[in-house]
Every structure is written in structure tokens, then in C-alpha cells.
């Protein structure tokens, strides 16, 4: 598995993930990029789960974003509909965390689309550790979204054996209206 964490704070949304890929109890790769930019760099996304499955989902989600003119929530719902009804997709074992200027969402393997409380997402085997640390940092510090993601990934990596200390982090600056 892995750890993906997303935080939205002070006109920034950030998604970060570790770089470890395991096969059974063996580390196969330590610098995988599980977070990427999509749709003309307006959407950031991270995955937890099977690597091949996740790349398939990235491609499918990017196609949905294009079809839905970059509307994140609409694309996520359309993706979830396909995930629920397509036999091949139902066999894919992965979760996606996606965000743009307006929303942060989790797309599950069951075809659910979840907008979490406080725009905090943490998925994967290290997700509970990252979520707890990010929540504590959000509530008790003035750290930036990026700093919270970095520290949460470090904490998760110190606890979860399926999470390492080689993160990929992507950030979007949210344009304020006015």
C-alpha cells in the first residue's frame, strides 16, 4: 500500500504521497510517483492501491475530466458510475484522492465519491497515521498546507512499513475572487 494525504489551507491545496512500491513483503521500488497533475495542471491526484490499477484509473479519470470540461465533481461522479457498472473496473483495487481549486474528493473502488470533512484526505495503509497528524497540525499550528502534508507523510513513514520517506508533492494555488 502507500500513504496519500491532501490538505487545503490558506488558498493552497496540496496532495503528497510516498514513493514505496511493495510486492508482498519486498520493496520493489522506492521512488514511485503516486501523485500527479492532470487536466492542464488544474487538478492534482494521488493513488493508493495496486500500481497498475491506479495508472488505469488515472487514465480513465483524465478522460472523464476532458469529457466533463475539467469539472472535478462531475468527472468523479461519472467515473464512479463506470466503476460500479463495468466488470473490469470493479476488479481494480485502488483509491484516488483528487483536488482542484474548489473541491477535494476521494473516489473509492466501490464507486463512491466522498468529499471529506475539513478538506482533509488520507488514504492507503499509512492513511490513519497521516490523517491523525494532519488533523492535529491543522487544529494546533499555523503551518502551510504543504508543511502539514510533508510532516504527515514523515510521521506516517515512521510508523507504517508500507510507506517510505521519498515523497512526491503537488500543490495548487487557489485563485481568490475579487
UniProtKB/Swiss-Prot annotation:
Q: Which family does it belong to?
A: Belongs to the peptidase T1B family. HslV subfamily.
Q: How is its activity regulated?
A: Allosterically activated by HslU binding.
HAMAP family, per database record: HslV
- Indicate what this protein is called per its UniProt record: ATP-dependent protease subunit HslV
Give the encoding gene's name: hslV
Its annotated function is as follows: Protease subunit of a proteasome-like degradation complex believed to be a general protein degrading machinery.
The places in or outside the cell where this protein is found are:
Cytoplasm
| Reactions performed catalytically | ATP-dependent cleavage of peptide bonds with broad specificity
Q: What is the lineage of its organism?
A: Bacteria, Pseudomonadati, Pseudomonadota, Gammaproteobacteria, Enterobacterales
Write the record's keywords in alphabetical order, separated by commas: Allosteric enzyme, Cytoplasm, Hydrolase, Metal-binding, Protease, Sodium, Threonine protease
State the active site.
Answer: 2
Entry EC number(s): 3.4.25.2
Task: List the GO terms this entry assigns under cellular component, sorted alphabetically.
Answer: HslUV protease complex; proteasome core complex
| Complexes and interactors | A double ring-shaped homohexamer of HslV is capped on each side by a ring-shaped HslU homohexamer. The assembly of the HslU/HslV complex is dependent on binding of ATP.
| Annotated source species | Hamiltonella defensa subsp. Acyrthosiphon pisum (strain 5AT)
PROSITE patterns under this entry?
Answer: PROTEASOME_BETA_2 (PS51476)
